[in-house]
Amino acid sequence: MKNSKFIILKYFMLCILFSLAFSELKVGEPAPTFYIRTLEEKNFFMSDTLKHDKPIILSFFATWCVPCREEIPVLDSVRQEFPDIKFYLVDVSGLNTNGKAMIEDSLQVANMINYLKVDMLVLMDLYGKTAEKYAVKELPTLIVIDPEGKISYVHTGYTKGDENELISILNGYVNEKK
């Protein structure tokens, strides 16, 4: 009897772990809030940003990710077309707890951002907690949060032309506001 209870408990725990491993962010769900440091070492609270009733764009990237380096300047161009919409880059390059590696990662990110000549706030997800909350499994991952604070679009990867769908979505928000 004890053995069967143990097997049932073990099966139940396995089911929970399995479901967590395959969890994903779903369109229509509230955007997870988080606290994170910026590249400039300032505090950033997503909960404050969500209060502004405007769409928010999060792009999860890494310095070593080639499609990310292609997407970032394109996102910056799109950002310039939509000045009222907040765009944030979330760096996941240095997922470790080694202080030296974090400093090196910050320098690499700063160098990449300067090289690409983009003007977006960079958030440093050094421990991967934000990427985990947003179920990021592939880079780049682009997430659009609607003015009500809900996930409205999730896109992984980047190929030239992917930005057209983002522009269409953002135009919808701008036209809705008029």
Model-flagged regions — what are they?
Residues 1-10:
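Positively charged n-region of N-terminal signal peptides that target proteins for export
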Residues 10-19:
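Bacterial N-terminal signal peptides
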Residues 18-33, 107:
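N-proximal helix/coil linker or "cap" segments that precede and/or mark the start of modular domains
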Residues 35-56:
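A short beta-strand-turn-helix
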Residues 53-56, 61-64, 94, 138:
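Short pre-active-site segment immediately N-terminal to redox-active cysteine/selenocysteine motifs
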Residues 57-58, 87, 142:
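Hydrophobic beta-strand anchors of alpha/beta hydrolase catalytic cores
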Residues 70-115, 126-132:
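Structural microenvironment flanking redox-active thiols in thiol-disulfide oxidoreductases
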Residues 115-118, 125-169:
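Thiol/disulfide oxidoreductase modules built on the thioredoxin-like
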